[in-house]
Amino acid sequence: MSQWGPRAILVQTDSTNRNADGDWQAAVAIRGGGVVQLNMVNKRAVDFTPAECGDSEWAVGRVSLGLRMAMPRDFCAIIHAPAVSGPGPHVMLGLVDSGYRGTVLAVVVAPNGTRGFAPGALRVDVTFLDIRATPPTLTEPSSLHRFPQLAPSPLAGLREDPWLDGALATAGGAVALPARRRGGSLVYAGELTQVTTEHGDCVHEAPAFLPKREEDAGFDILIHRAVTVPANGATVIQPSLRVLRAADGPEACYVLGRSSLNARGLLVMPTRWPSGHACAFVVCNLTGVPVTLQAGSKVAQLLVAGTHALPWIPPDNIHEDGAFRAYPRGVPDATATPRDPPILVFTNEFDADAPPSKRGAGGFGSTGI
């Protein structure tokens, strides 16, 4: 795509595809701060074939947007609901990596029994964002520095989450820990092991934030112990005791869901991770059966972008009830400092014009869950 410049994004819609009229209408919009969007609406009836949802009021399924994209490696696309929309189907927030070359699918949640959408019923925004390749700066677990004498032995038979009880007893009384409990269903999903160093015994925490590959938009968030999310319920997951340090530049960290889990009816409430706090996010189970996320699963992803990149995602968005009541919709930010927007280049020769990528058309869990 070098012929169009380093900020060019190649786009093919089903309407620009040769000899095809397409099911979707797409319009380009530039929002506050130079943020570029595609605003899409279905102009024909769209079939909806949800996955088995059991005893649930909701049906979850994928809908093709008839859209393919090729972005520079420092860009990603966010699939989300528009700022203003009616009480119809819910479009779950999704993240598209720069290396994805397949047709973009939106995860849609609708009342159980829905099998299609009338023309104009589905409205989807695609927002293009600059992203940062630098991982966030985290503290060590508090126990390493403040409580080395309290490192729990894996064989001590202690409570399942000894570090999340809010206090541990010492010879001098109770000592408060910075890990916060949000409601009764917070689950610490990290892994702590006792290690011996030249400075004495301390606790090591297994990495919860995996290195980012070149074409990835976000850093995968890993859990080290199984977590069960109840049927039609929600669980708050804290993957690590590490605290986010204040960024030196205009950056913010956002916790977003994974497409593969969204499509199974497991929705991560998008949340901005504020500095000075440990990471925590809500997983909502819209199915009628309990779902267990196995140890070693990638359950969310961490996106590092500009402070004003996603202003409509609230910080510390911990709500254990009403997956949609507080689910954020896109809101343009009119106060951000303007910057040079990317250039959208529409083509009907996508396969010939798009540069090759390692990921190709693999998506929805193709890189592991």
UniProtKB/Swiss-Prot annotation:
Record carries keyword Oxidoreductase: no
Keyword check for Transit peptide: no
Annotated substrate binding sites: R258, S259, S260, F364, G365
Gene Ontology terms: biological process: dUTP metabolic process
Catalysis performed (reactions): dUTP + H2O = dUMP + diphosphate + H(+)
Any GO MF annotation of the entry: dUTP diphosphatase activity
Keyword terms, alphabetized: Hydrolase, Magnesium, Metal-binding, Nucleotide metabolism
Known EC number: 3.6.1.23
Listed Pfam families: dUTPase (PF00692)
Cofactor(s) named in the record: Mg(2+)
Family designation: Belongs to the dUTPase family.
HAMAP family: HSV_DUT (MF_04031)
Function (record text): Involved in nucleotide metabolism: produces dUMP, the immediate precursor of thymidine nucleotides and decreases the intracellular concentration of dUTP to avoid uracil incorporation into viral DNA.
Official protein name in the record: Deoxyuridine 5'-triphosphate nucleotidohydrolase
